[in-house]
Amino acid sequence: MTRRTDAHPDLNRTDAGAPFFSTWSVGTPLRQRQTVEAIGATWERRPWPSDGLLGYYVYTGHDASTLLHHSQWRSEQAYEAFVKTHRQERVDEIDTAVPGIERLRLDRYRHYRSVRRPDDTRVPGCIVIVEIEFEESAADSRRAWVDAVIEALESEPDPHPGGISGHFHLGTDGTRVLNYAEWESAQAHIDALAAPGDGIGSARQEWERVQTWPGLKSSTVSRYEYALGLIPDRTRP
C-alpha cells in the first residue's frame, strides 16, 4: 500500500537512477492546499504502483500558485511502465477534485554531486530550486560548472549559516542543471541573497567565474515548502 511520510527525500540515494522534477500551476494558495490533499487521498487509497518508484514528494511554491513534484525512480523504464498502467487514473481523480490544473512540464535528471556538512542534521524549512540552462554548445561543460560551484561553496570564508545542503542534477536533455538546495528557512535564503555579492556567495573571484561561465544561458530561483511525501508501506500487503 501507500503511506504518507514527513521525512524529506534523500537526494543522495544511489538506487534512484532516474530522479524527475515537474511543476504544476494551480493558481491560488487555497488550490495549492486542495491539490496537495487530492494527491494524497488519490494515492493513499491505491496500492503503491511499482517497485521501481522509491518515493513521490510535493512542495508548495512561495509564489502562491505552483506545486513542485519530485519523484525518485529506479529507472526511466519503470516510469514509462507506470505511465502506461497507473498514471491516468490518478490524474483523472485529481483533476475531478481540483479542475483546471496546468501541468507545465516534466524534466528528467541524473544526480551528479551533493554538498553538505556531515554533522548537519537540521530539517530544512525551505527548499530552493535553482534551474540553470546552458547553450547546447556548452552542454559538455555542465559537470565542470557544478564542480566550480561546489569549489566556491566549500571555499567560502563566511558561508551563510542558514544553508544546509545542495544537490546538483544534470538534465537528460543535455542543457539543464538543477540544484535542489535545502535551507533552514525562506528568510535565511532571502538574507543570503541580500548580502554583498551576486547570489548567495560573497564578491570573490570563484563566484564571478561561476556567474560568467561560457555558454551559461539563464537561471531561475524558486522557493518551496515541503507539503507531502508518499512512500510504499512495507508493513501492509
Model-derived segments and their meaning:
Residues 1-70, 74-237:
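Short S/T/G/P-rich N-terminal loop/turn motif that feeds into the first structured element of a domain
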